[in-house]
Amino acid sequence: MKQPFFRGACTALVTPFLGGKVNYPMMEQLLRRQIDAGIEAVVICGTTGESATLSDCEKLELFRRAKAYVGDSCLIIAGTGSNCTEHAAALSRAAEGAGADALLVVTPYYNKATPEGLLAHYSAVAGAVHIPVIAYNVPSRTGVDIPVEVYDRLSRIPNLAGVKEASSSISKIAKLCAACPDFPVWSGNDDQAVAVMSLGGQGVISVLSNVAPVETQAMAQAALAGDFDTAAALQAELLPLIELLFCEVNPIPVKAAMQLIGYDCGGCRLPLTPMSNENLEKLKKYLL
């Protein structure tokens, strides 16, 4: 079996902005909060980190500064996906050079690669680096869904360390876990974290843990320990917040939530716009 290089909750960190620029001092505050909460891995420049509207130079500086700040206290997983294989491979090499411990690489989006294209893409990207690569399957955003039968072939790529599964299909994830029991799977959806871990998943790459890192990690660790009654109860308590964090497109609500709890991360870059007043009031009512 490929041993998972982390288990439990990993936070898909928001990218804080100030005056339109990356707010590095705030990023360090966010990282410190995650470490203090017991989070052992953080994704920088994932979907929640607004990777689509960050330049490569900004991404590499975020990777470098994040790793320099956390040292060995936390794994830095760099989001380096692209729908251009050459670009994804080049950015992945640069991220490794900037100190990233691992990479999160989304499936090529928009151009709708075939299964053979997906295999070639991940083989090329993983072959360009010497650190673990996590595939990221999120068909609602990319327009492509990795078929279950392709995962067995993907799992043979030496440093392809597993997959963040955000297809939202529990039946599909159940088939994946049964067909490829030696291939690590992390839930990409907070509301399905316990279900995925009950099927053999290794944890969750979480939006929720930006706001509630202690509680998210407690839920994940209970599930990993086989205490699914406790894990399910903890998740039930968190479901109202999870629903609020996804009442509009991610990361609009989570950035609003961070400001409400005292971490001013700024707004999102266009084309994402501020949270509606109606939903913001619901979020305030829950958090304040």
Give names to the regions the model predicted.
Residues 54-57, 90, 115-118, 146-148, ...:
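Short secondary-structure transition/capping segments
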Residues 8-15, 33, 37-39, 198-201, ...:
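C-terminal alpha-helical cap/extension of soluble enzyme domains
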Residues 2-11, 15-143, 151-152:
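Active-site beta->alpha loop and helix N-cap motifs at the rims of alpha/beta catalytic domains
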Residues 127-128, 139-246:
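Catalytic alpha/beta core domains of metabolic enzymes, predominantly
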Residues 2-5, 175, 258:
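Catalytic cores of TIM-barrel enzymes
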Residues 28, 60, 64, 89, ...:
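Generic alpha-helical structural signal
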Residues 74-75, 133, 162, 184, ...:
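Secondary-structure boundary/capping signal
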